[in-house]
């Protein structure tokens, strides 16, 4: 078996052992708090903007915190929303395709509804008063400048004289992945620039310099799927700034076979790249790329790789620290589907680009480090003070020797891969019912340290709020899912996510619309100190009276209680109710069950992460015993199910939860078992009168009462008795029963006995709220 197959089997085996265990606790991978779409709206935690037509068909989103605006690109339109209000006064600019473009798109065989329109896909800041917007233009990409005004103004209109071709800036298709960033008046874009989507390139355009693009050599880009582009400075010398592209590509198998594999890359080009003078004219002369590795170590050195790059978030640090790259990956294996989050230090990426180049003698050979002499200036290095040395005036890439450019063209790949921090993912998800598409991160200062809160957007319209606790070294981090927030009413893939640390808001976009979501709402965790502490949310702390937002400036106050790493309320919440006190505070609720039938005792803990335990106190016993489950008694997620109730099951059941050593009582239920002999006494059998023969034809069969199906499903053993009782109740107060019951004289007799049935019902504490003249549902329908 191949090493990768061994790794997959090892990972699946571990997941099956973990997920299939009969332990009482689902673990911290289950969200502690689940909030539905309605819950978020009622708590005033989210605000939704769906556009004037009820659906935006969102394609692009740009968060401008300088202007306090959120700009959206949709179907034939752009929108501007103010951040200081919940979308009360949006601005809209209609931007349909130019005359004739839609018709030409249809003639070329494209779909008139989903493709032959202007899908606005690029929104980039152009200057202090304008945005650069580009759309697909019905498969004829178009760009224009959008006036947005100065800070404090809420204006939005398109400059008609600025409309120009967007080829090389925006994809032709509305669904094809791409990435772009705007730097010093120029747009850098990674995309497929042709109508058929086959010509992949990295393109620079829009400024005073000539346009620059990738070489057409297939060794540079193999069917890339661009995810992100960003300018990342390396030092104080701006001439050394580079634009980094994060993407996946499909390459030939490294073993020289005919198969292809998917790998993730980080590539870069210099901002001041001007191409070559004789070689690589108007082409990138500083392009390099390296592999991004995100894998789970397995036995024997085998690794399970997550090779498909889904999204990237740059966590900019405070002064003196290295930038961190959070990357979301997925598997491309047909065996199982999984997702992982890996974190890379930017210093490690720089080290790889300063390392050896990858080289092989031919397509059938293995890759190895280049062992020859590397020309000067080193290929991939930007023209700067380092290269403009006395006697070697390399002030521009056009001054680079031809051998440098030829080497750069032949060796764009680095030999060393970029490995994540601690050598493994900080988060692995392989048991999700949904897929993960988007990631943003917020670094939060808590009482016991600093934590990175990860927000993950799914394909079902929900957001997962997660923290990963690293124990140190290469140990596997502990994953804690804090919340699962259903942002949109209808399940829809989340395609855009932006975070505003200043406003403590998350902006979530989908094809339907955009939502403004608070990063935290601490009071939803509960009203007790223990519940606030067990939540382990870095945003929240107990202030002595309630669970509120933690502010580091106030963190030194004595009564601020917070424990993210351990979540131990016993240490943080002294004087709170213990288990024995909690049992006495929860009143017991009476529950009745019938012998030999099924009965369900419901227990819904506040936290799905807690371990649930059932205790039974039988009459006469000194203390409670733990309920033992078997084929007859089942422990489900929502409570305790008795498939066949016994008279010995009577007693007081206490449902308790245990989480991080803290136990609390959820519910107490006093189960009273009604034995079968008692039912026989309550409903004595009566002789059945002879039925008159049918008048010709087939004998008519009375319709079956609706309640009989339910009683048969739960295995009720005294169906004739209940049937008899129900007929008496329905016939009470009427002069004639329905045709599906007995004769009129029989109904009069039943009316006389119906009061006895009511008295019996009172003794059984049954709750009958039906009206006096209620009839079976089947009779009402006739």
From Swiss-Prot:
PANTHER family (UniProt xref): SEMAPHORIN, SEMAPHORIN-3G
GO molecular-function terms, A-Z: chemorepellent activity; neuropilin binding; semaphorin receptor binding; signaling receptor binding
Sites where a glycan is attached: 44, 127
Gene3D superfamilies cross-referenced by the UniProt entry: Immunoglobulins, ligand-binding face of the semaphorins, domain 2, YVTN repeat-like/Quinoprotein amine dehydrogenase
Family per similarity comment: Belongs to the semaphorin family.
Signal peptide positions (record): 1-22
Record-linked PROSITE patterns: IG_LIKE, SEMA
Pfam family, one: Sema
GO cellular component: extracellular exosome; plasma membrane
InterPro entries: Ig-like_dom, Ig-like_dom_sf, Ig-like_fold, Immunoglobulin_dom, PSI, Semap_dom, Semap_dom_sf, Semaphorin
Function as written in the Swiss-Prot or TrEMBL entry: Has chemorepulsive activities for sympathetic axons. Ligand of NRP2.
Residues of the Sema domain: 32-519
CDD domains membership: Ig_Sema3, Sema_3G
Source species: Homo sapiens
Keywords per UniProt: Disulfide bond, Glycoprotein, Immunoglobulin domain, Secreted, Signal
Name this protein carries in UniProt: Semaphorin-3G
GO biological process terms held by the UniProt record: axon guidance; negative chemotaxis; negative regulation of axon extension; neural crest cell migration; positive regulation of cell migration; semaphorin-plexin signaling pathway
Disulfide bonds: 105-116, 134-143, 270-382, 294-342, 522-540, 603-655
Subcellular location: Secreted
Ig-like C2-type domain residues: 569-671
Keyword Lipid biosynthesis set for record: no
């Amino acid at each position: 078996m191949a090493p990768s197959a061994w790794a997959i089997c090892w990972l699946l085996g571990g997941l099956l052992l973990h997920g299939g265990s009969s332990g009482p606790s689902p673990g911290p991978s289950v969200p502690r708090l689940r909030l539905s779409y309605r819950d978020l709206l009622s708590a005033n935690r989210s605000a939704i903007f769906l556009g004037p037509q009820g659906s935006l068909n969102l394609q692009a989103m740009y968060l401008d915190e300088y202007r306090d605006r959120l700009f959206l690109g949709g179907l034939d339109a752009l929108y501007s929303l103010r951040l200081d209000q919940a979308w009360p006064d949006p601005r809209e600019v209609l931007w349909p395709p130019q005359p004739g473009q839609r018709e030409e798109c249809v003639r070329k065989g494209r779909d008139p509804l989903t493709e032959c329109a202007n899908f606005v896909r690029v929104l980039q800041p152009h200057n202090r008063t304008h945005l650069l917007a580009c759309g697909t233009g019905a498969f004829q990409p178009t760009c224009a400048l959008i006036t947005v005004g100065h800070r404090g103004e809420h204006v939005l209109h398109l400059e008609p004289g600025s409309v120009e071709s967007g080829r090389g800036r925006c994809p032709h298709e509305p669904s094809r992945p791409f990435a772009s960033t705007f730097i010093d008046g120029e747009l850098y874009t990674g995309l497929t620039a042709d109508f058929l989507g086959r010509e992949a390139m990295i393109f620079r355009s829009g400024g005073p310099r000539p346009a620059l693009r990738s070489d057409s050599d297939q060794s540079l880009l193999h069917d890339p799927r661009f995810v992100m582009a960003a300018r990342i400075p390396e030092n104080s010398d701006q001439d050394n700034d580079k634009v980094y592209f994060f993407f996946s590509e499909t390459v030939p198998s490294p073993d020289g076979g005919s198969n292809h594999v998917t790998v993730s890359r980080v590539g870069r080009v210099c901002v001041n790249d001007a191409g070559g003078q004789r070689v690589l004219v108007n082409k990138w002369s500083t392009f390099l790329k390296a592999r991004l590795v995100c894998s789970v170590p397995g036995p024997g050195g085998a690794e399970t790789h997550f090779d498909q790059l889904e999204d990237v978030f740059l966590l900019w640090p405070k002064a003196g620290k290295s930038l961190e790259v959070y990357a979301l990956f997925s598997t491309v294996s047909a065996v199982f589907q999984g997702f992982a989050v890996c974190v890379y230090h930017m210093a490690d990426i720089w080290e790889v680009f300063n390392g050896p180049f990858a080289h092989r003698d031919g397509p059938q050979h293995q890759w190895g480090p280049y062992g020859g002499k590397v020309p000067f200036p080193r290929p991939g290095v930007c023209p700067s003070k380092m290269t403009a040395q006395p006697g070697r005036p390399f002030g521009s890439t056009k001054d680079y020797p031809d051998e440098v450019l030829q080497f750069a063209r032949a060796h764009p790949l680095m030999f060393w891969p970029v490995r994540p921090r601690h050598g493994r993912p900080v988060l692995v998800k392989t048991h999700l019912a949904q897929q993960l598409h988007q990631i943003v991160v917020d670094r939060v200062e808590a009482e016991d340290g600093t934590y990175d809160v990860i927000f993950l957007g799914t394909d079902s319209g929900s957001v997962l709020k997660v923290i990963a606790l690293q124990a140190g070294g290469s140990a596997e981090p502990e994953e804690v899912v804090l919340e699962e927030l259903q942002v949109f009413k209808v399940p829809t893939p989340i395609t855009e996510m932006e975070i505003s640390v200043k406003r403590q808001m998350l902006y979530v976009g989908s094809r339907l619309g955009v939502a403004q979501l608070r990063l935290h709402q601490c009071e939803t965790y509960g009203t007790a100190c223990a519940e606030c502490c067990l939540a382990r949310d870095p945003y929240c702390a107990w202030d002595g009276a309630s669970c509120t937002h933690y502010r580091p400036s106030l963190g030194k106050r004595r009564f601020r209680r917070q424990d993210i790493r351990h979540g131990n309320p016993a240490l943080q919440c002294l004087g709170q109710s213990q288990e024995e006190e909690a049992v006495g505070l929860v009143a017991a609720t009476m529950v009745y069950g019938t012998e030999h039938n099924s009965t369900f005792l419901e227990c819904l803990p506040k936290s799905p992460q807690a371990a649930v335990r059932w205790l039974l106190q039988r009459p006469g016993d000194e203390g409670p015993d733990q309920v033992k489950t078997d084929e007859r008694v089942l422990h489900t997620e929502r409570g305790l199910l008795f498939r066949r109730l016994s008279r010995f099951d009577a007693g007081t059941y206490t449902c308790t939860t245990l989480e991080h050593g803290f136990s609390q009582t959820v519910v107490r239920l006093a189960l009273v078992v009604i034995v079968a002999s008692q039912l026989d006494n309550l409903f004595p059998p009566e002789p059945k009168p002879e039925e008159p023969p049918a008048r010709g034809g087939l004998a008519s069969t009375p319709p079956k009462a609706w309640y009989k199906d339910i009683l048969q499903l739960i295995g009720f053993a005294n169906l004739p008795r209940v049937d008899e009782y129900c007929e008496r109740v329905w016939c009470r107060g009427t002069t004639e029963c329905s045709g599906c019951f007995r004769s009129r004289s029989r109904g009069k007799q039943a009316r006389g006995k119906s009061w006895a049935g009511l008295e019996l019902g009172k003794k059984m504490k049954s709750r009958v709220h039906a009206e006096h003249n209620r009839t079976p549902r089947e009779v009402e329908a006739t």
